[in-house]
Amino acid sequence: MMRMADAWVRGTHPWCGWIRLVLLPAMLAPIWFGAMWGGMVIMTVWMMLPMLFPKPAGGSRWMTRACLGVQIWRSRPLGDPVGLLLVILSVGIIALAMLFAGRQDGLWLAVCVVCHVSLYVIFLTRCASSFDDRMRDGP
């Protein structure tokens, strides 16, 4: 059985991070089509991702640094109010996207998905930068 620490390290594999970035908006498709089992399948894949990838070869890839930065941010989310605001806005936009998916309003759903992904990539960029600063300055 995989230990939680191993799962965290494997979850920083770049492919794992990029797939997670795509899977959350993909959760809207089952809502659109009214096939909730599809959402359960996507959520299962989401949870199994760390088991599907090896530990990253190094820490030089942007997504690996971003995932490590997210882990640091999670320990002190109130220390970065801008990051917290980005996450809150991103979650709110996904909730709004769920509403538009249920109504099958494609235009507003697409707008919400683009906004969510943009905000989350900005958040990841901040986390990668924070991780780089921490590695440069020391813990």
Each language-model region and where it sits:
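Long, highly hydrophobic alpha-helical transmembrane signal-anchor segments
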Residues: 4-37
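Core segments of transmembrane alpha-helices
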Residues: 19-28, 83-98
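Helix-coil boundary and interhelical linker segments in multi-pass alpha-helical membrane proteins
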Residues: 28-41, 97-110
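Structured domain cores in non-transmembrane regions
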Residues: 38-39, 52-55, 81
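Hydrophobic core of alpha-helical transmembrane segments in multi-pass integral membrane proteins
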Residues: 43-50, 88-98, 113-123
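Membrane-water interface of transmembrane alpha-helices
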Residues: 49-65
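Juxtamembrane helix-capping/reentrant segments at transmembrane boundaries
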Residues: 65-85
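Glycine-rich, aromatic-bearing surface loops/beta-hairpins
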Residues: 104-139
